[in-house]
Amino acid sequence: MQRIQLNITGMSCSCCAPNGWNNLPNKLSDFSTLVNSATRVAAINLSEVTQTAEVCEAVRRAALCTDGGEALQRRQADADNARYLLIRLAVAAALFVPLAHLSVMFAVLPSTHFPGWEWMLTALAIPVVTWAAWPFHRVAIHNARYHGASMETLISTGITAATIWSLYTVFGHHQSTEHRGVWRALLGSDAIYFEVAAGITVFVLAGKYYTARAKSHASIALLALAALSAKDAAVLQPDGSEMVIPANELNEQQRFVVRPGQTIAADGLVIDGSATVSMSPITGEAKPVRVNPGAQVIGGTVVLNGRLIVEAAAVGDETQLAGMVRLVEQAQQQNANAQRLADRIASVFVPCVFAVAALTAVGWLIAGSGPDRVFSAAIAVLVIACPCALGLATPTAMMVASGRGAQLGILLKGHESFEATRAVDTVVFDKTGTLTTGQLKVSAVTAAPGWQANEVLQMAATVESASEHAVALAIAASTTHREPVANFRAVPGHGVSGTVAERAVRVGKPSWIASRCNSTTLVTARRNAELRGETAVFVEIDGEQCGVIAVADAVKASAADAVAALHDRGFRTALLTGDNPASAAAVASRIGIDEVIADILPEDKVDVIEQLRDRGHVVAMVGDGINDGPALARADLGMAIGRGTDVAIGAADIILVRDNLDVVPITLDLAAATMRTIKFNMVWAFGYNIAAIPIAAAGLLNPLVAGAAMAFSSFFVVSNSLRLRNFGAILSCGTSRHRTVKRWRCPPPTRLRSTACSPVDASPLRPVAHRTGVKPPTHR
């Protein structure tokens, strides 16, 4: 399968989406599409036999006006469309004002008629109902061609009918017999309907313009994110000179120079120089970071002072910035469950509105009303219905939220990320690399009697050098002289073994090596390390327990505040780790986590998540390592630290770009605020149509008022979604448990399960039995 994206510029609401696709040639039926009415982008999955060019040409023949350009270039179409509508709106409004005044005057005071007044009104109205209203007529014609209908069909029909009726009443000298005087004008029973046709055009164009402008604002976050990339790079030549090239021509392993005020052109490794780098464009963190040789840097960040020589490791579409843009776009293109329901309703909405309009006309005729009242009520029904509000209720909120999340360092992969947060009551944290910095260091080496500490450390470091586990890397980095290792084997969740200088060496957990340790020295060293919250690693050489290596990992400064913020919001927290219970309990006590689940094998983390879910909890998991991948996938909501492994990032629903736990409560707040916005939009969209159509059918609304109400409805939905752009403006999660947590304007997420704090739920989980499952390679 191959995936392409097309810009559907001729689509305005959910009703438009199925029309073209349902009428494409049968030979192109071997593809599936996902069309988003807010972004107007169709994601098409093609089979191998289907040619991309065939699909594009078929869609163009269906008059869907495709554009296969870059996705970010397509975002500019919203701004261009807003300018296009503004021109038509300005001309229509300039003609509508005198037209409305003259029409009311001629209707209320027939004595003001003068020779040629009919032609004056016609001259003012025709440009409005034809040229200015052409965007509606064009889509309506397309829909009629393919036996479909949309909001534009309703508007075009209303404008056309009002224009034809106006020509008949003006040139046929039709006189109304109802509602004489000024009340006739207010109640919409005038014999002149030019101002109605023009007024509908003006109000709907105004709504379309403001909606298009708001939608272009909704994409600003994504455009700003893409604009962070550097335009050029100063590549270092072998002779020491520099050559400036476009950043998109930079290749991996090329070295480039970055000076103060310049943007780093690609992800890479600092080879030479020191500088302070602003990470805020990518991670949202305001505090600059000091980088030195050997540090990794991210493309799109800005050097504040100092000079760096960077070796490119990821360029072009492989950079972290490009990946962020792709994730945000993918999130914006997906349709939530609520939106799929709205789309199904919208697909039958327009035919139902036509039926209601026809029944309204028949009903008023049976009641003995005159043609003016019949016509006014039917037109009001047509123009007041707003399927557009239904189509925009969810995708606009998700589009704004995903863009705002990217600015805050939160990448949401799709609508599941939003929907899963509604019932989350428990947040489970991994320890190493998540709650702690992951930068482990050897803090102490204790040798058994008859052994030397240097010898123990060197033998252990030699074996650990073949593993990529965080503890192994720390031990391996503690010494530079290492012998070759043979027969290396990693036992996930336990440790490693190998042969060094013909001596069998095992390094790993006390439970694996020293289940029965008779050395008082080693037992004391282990106890002291665990009381300090450090990890104790035993070393065995030729079957003899010869030493204990204590590895320390600093707790992140943001961990305690983040956990306190979660507690203030009503969430329960748990620590899930393969470390020993004493060390895990020390870390949990320092941070304030409710529950500790320690000494867990990597494959058993999934079982722990399942146990929590079986007890009625809705679980969010935060992790960063390879062995966290299955648990992140099993949890109701998986959050991966951005600097984590590809496995963790791939399994998670949300990626936290910042290496800062303050973003965890912010993420849950953003998702909850987004779901509240979507719910409010849906209530408004359904409520408006349910209430407005009967009022219009009852003849209580002038068609002008109906057109204005319809335009306002869709504009209201988009504007309400745009409120999410300000999310986090007054949010401060960097709070201690002794300070009041400032939240966004909306209330915090509520606990949906009262059993969360019951005595049964508060009891710790027993470590689950080992079971066969996912075995992460060389990790414990």
Curated annotation (Swiss-Prot):
Keywords: ATP-binding, Cell membrane, Copper, Copper transport, Ion transport, Membrane, Metal-binding, Nucleotide-binding, Phosphoprotein, Translocase, Transmembrane, Transmembrane helix, Transport. GO terms for molecular function: ATP binding; ATP hydrolysis activity; copper ion binding; P-type divalent copper transporter activity; P-type monovalent copper transporter activity. The active site is at D430. InterPro entries: ATPase_P-typ_cyto_dom_N, ATPase_P-typ_P_site, ATPase_P-typ_TM_dom_sf, ATPase_P-typ_transduc_dom_A_sf, Cation-trans_P-type_ATPase_A/B, HAD-like_sf, HAD_sf, Heavy-metal-associated_CS. It catalyses: Cu(+)(in) + ATP + H2O = Cu(+)(out) + ADP + phosphate + H(+). The keyword Phosphoprotein applies. It is an enzyme of class 7 (translocase). Cu(+) binds at C13, C16. The keyword Ribosomal protein does not apply. The chain crosses the membrane at residues 89-109, 114-134, 153-173, 185-205, 348-368, 374-394, 680-698, 704-722. Its main location: membrane. GO terms for biological process: copper ion homeostasis. Disulfide bonds: none annotated. Pfam families: E1-E2_ATPase, Hydrolase. GO terms for cellular component: plasma membrane. It comes from the Bacteria. It is found in: Cell membrane. Belongs to the cation transport ATPase (P-type) (TC 3.A.3) family. Type IB subfamily. NCBIfam families: ATPase-IB1_Cu (TIGR01511), ATPase-IB_hvy (TIGR01525), ATPase_P-type (TIGR01494). Involved in copper export. This is Copper-exporting P-type ATPase. The gene is ctpA.
